[in-house]
Structure formats: structure tokens, C-alpha cells
Amino acid sequence: FMTAHITAASLVSENKVLTHPASVDTISTSGGQEDFVSMAPWAGRKCLRVIDNVRNILAIELLTSTTINELFHAPLKMARCTQPVIKLLKKHVHFSKGDRPLHTDIKIINDLIKTNRILSWVNKNYELK
């Protein structure tokens, strides 16, 4: 899982660059007659990319932490609010010790995050007190 963590670290570094304010890169237009050039479209595209990167980072963290718990620390009991998440992940991802490409599992978990299935599952299976 070292490669997965390297990927997550790379995505975090990319987010550092993407969160540089877009307004700093404003460009003069109309022969210098326009005082204001909206950088909103570029800022919006960068924001969407950051959101996608964060989903991938969370997917990697969920995959690696759940795999390690399931394969090496069972029967370590997770926190009550974490248990529903692990239960949902087990329905969609096969956890095994062998080497395998992780892309498919990361994509599955990313989709569970993107579609709010993890959040809905936790809300349904965990009662806040």
C-alpha cells in the first residue's frame, strides 16, 4: 500500500498548487482598458479538481486503513461511528493480502463518497447521541 500513500501525498501536493489564488494570475485585456478580469471560471475548474483529489485521498485512506484493520488487526474493534463505514466498504471492496491493482477499489470508494452513499449509510446505521 506504499504506492497508494505516495499517490495520496502527490494529490495533496497538487492541491497545494491548485489552491493558489486565481486572482493573482489576472491578465490585462482590451489593451489595458479593462480594470477587472474575472478569474472565476479558472478558479471554479481548480476547485472542482481539488474536490476530486480530496475524494481520491479519502478513498485511499479508507481503503488502506480498512484493509490493514481487516487483515492484520482483526478483531480490533473500531469506533461505533466507523463500524457502519467498514460494513459498507466490505459490501463493495474485497480486502486481500495479495498484491493487486488498487485503482478499481479506489474508484469504487470514490464513487461511494461522491454519491453520498457513505454519508447516507452512516446516518442510517449510526445514531448520534
Language-model features: locations:
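C-terminal auxiliary extensions adjacent to catalytic cores
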Residues: 1-129
